[in-house]
């Protein structure tokens, strides 16, 4: 930490970065406190929640290209948009990021973090394993509402299930395989399109062949 800036490696948990911000009385990173994942992943997909996004707090990112070249990219050149960035588009490897925040009241910062945590506990299926929000929000719609309107609340493929608590989440009820989760997502995408004409796009990233 240097003045209002936090320097963190790509492997740093977002919760740890948020805790550091709180301990230094820095505000602006509260939205990310409950997002499960690391700083590198958050930078790559411009992670966000509750009105906040990484593009609002990033100053610069150090990356490595496929050719082994090291680059420092300022936020203005990151191409940060809804769940994407130049890092993703060019498949760069994030090494480190500089977060620029503002001085704030630590009590107020903690209050906001606690409030957002309560919202997550109340509205999201945190009692089950999941990869978080499964589908991107289509423009003008909410993915969870489209899934619910298609009659898919609680829909299952093996141990993979559309959460009954929040239809925007696909959960693992115990022993779901990647194949089951992918099949569930495919069926959800198809059924939602049949019902509403809207084709959902996965927010989670697929790694490997399916």
Model-identified regions with their sequence ranges:
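Short beta-strand or tight-loop elements
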Residues: 27, 57, 76-78
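Short acidic (Asp/Glu) patches
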Residues: 15, 45-47, 76-82
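Short polybasic amphipathic segments
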Residues: 59-63
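Phosphate/pyrophosphate- and phosphate-bearing ligand-binding catalytic cores of soluble enzymes
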Residues: 64-186, 190-210
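A glycine- and small-aliphatic-rich helix-loop capping segment at beta-alpha/alpha-beta transitions
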Residues: 20-26, 45-56
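Acidic/polar active-site rim loop that often engages polyanionic ligands
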Residues: 1-3, 43, 92-96
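Core subunits and conserved enzymes of cellular information-processing
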Residues: 8, 40-51, 71
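Anion-binding (especially nucleotide phosphate/pyrophosphate-binding) glycine-rich loop
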Residues: 1-39
């Amino acid at each position: 930490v240097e003045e209002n800036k936090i320097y963190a490696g790509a492997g740093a948990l977002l919760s740890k970065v948020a805790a550091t911000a709180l301990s230094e009385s820095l505000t602006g990173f509260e939205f990310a406190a409950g997002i499960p994942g690391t700083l590198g992943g958050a930078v790559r997909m411009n992670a966000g929640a509750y009105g906040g996004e990484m593009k609002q707090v990033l100053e610069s990112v150090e990356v490595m290209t496929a050719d082994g070249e090291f680059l420092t990219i300022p936020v203005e050149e990151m191409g940060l948009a809804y769940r994407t960035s130049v890092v993703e588009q060019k498949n760069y490897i994030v090494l480190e990021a500089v977060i620029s925040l503002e001085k704030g009241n630590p009590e107020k910062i903690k209050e906001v973090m606690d409030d957002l945590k309560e919202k997550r506990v109340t509205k999201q299926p945190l009692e089950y394993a999941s990869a978080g929000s499964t589908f991107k929000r289509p423009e003008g719609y909410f993915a969870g509402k489209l899934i619910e309107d298609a009659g898919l609340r609680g829909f299952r493929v093996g141990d993979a299930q559309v959460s009954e608590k929040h239809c925007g989440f696909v959960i693992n009820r115990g022993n779901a395989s990647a194949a089951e989760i992918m099949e569930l997502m495919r069926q959800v995408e198809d059924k939602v399109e049949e019902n509403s004409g809207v084709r959902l796009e996965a927010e989670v990233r697929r790694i490997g062949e399916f």
